[in-house]
């Protein structure tokens, strides 16, 4: 008998096992929306390393579950050290102010 983890448990596990997690549409190599592409570019510009990505288009339960988990309605979503940072617009603002680089120890 296989025990299924519920979606929120899967998300908690992904966030706890990776220092940086980006929930996005598509992959870093082939983003499927402009906001996800922008998020990847911002992380690259910050010098973020070992970024785990989750393609929400591959799993409907994760796509809806991450929105419920964060209480944030849009994708992409960035988590750093277990904390929800925000989406592409917030990432851009934080990058421009230098705050995002500090999260990665790159300031």
Regions of interest found by a model, annotated:
Residues 48-63:
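Thiol-based oxidoreductase modules, predominantly thioredoxin-like and allied folds used
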Residues 1-4:
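Short, Lys/Arg-enriched N-terminal segments with co-localized hydrophobic residues
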Residues 80-107:
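Non-catalytic, surface beta->alpha helical segment in thiol-disulfide oxidoreductase systems
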Residues 68-74:
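Thiol/disulfide oxidoreductase modules built on the thioredoxin-like
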Residues 11-13, 92:
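Short secondary-structure boundary/capping segments
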Residues 7-9:
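Eukaryotic intrinsically disordered and solvent-exposed regulatory patches
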């Amino acid at each position: 008998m296989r025990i299924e983890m519920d979606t929120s448990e899967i998300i908690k596990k992904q966030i706890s096992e990776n220092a940086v997690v980006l929930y996005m549409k598509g992959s870093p190599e082939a983003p499927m929306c402009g906001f996800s592409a922008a998020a990847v570019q911002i992380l690259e510009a910050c010098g973020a390393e070992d970024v785990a990505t989750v393609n929400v288009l591959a799993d409907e339960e994760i796509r809806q579950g991450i929105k419920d988990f964060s209480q944030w309605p849009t994708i992409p979503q960035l988590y750093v050290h277990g904390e929800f940072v925000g989406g592409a617009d917030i990432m851009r603002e934080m990058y421009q102010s230098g705050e995002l680089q500090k999260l990665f120890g790159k300031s």
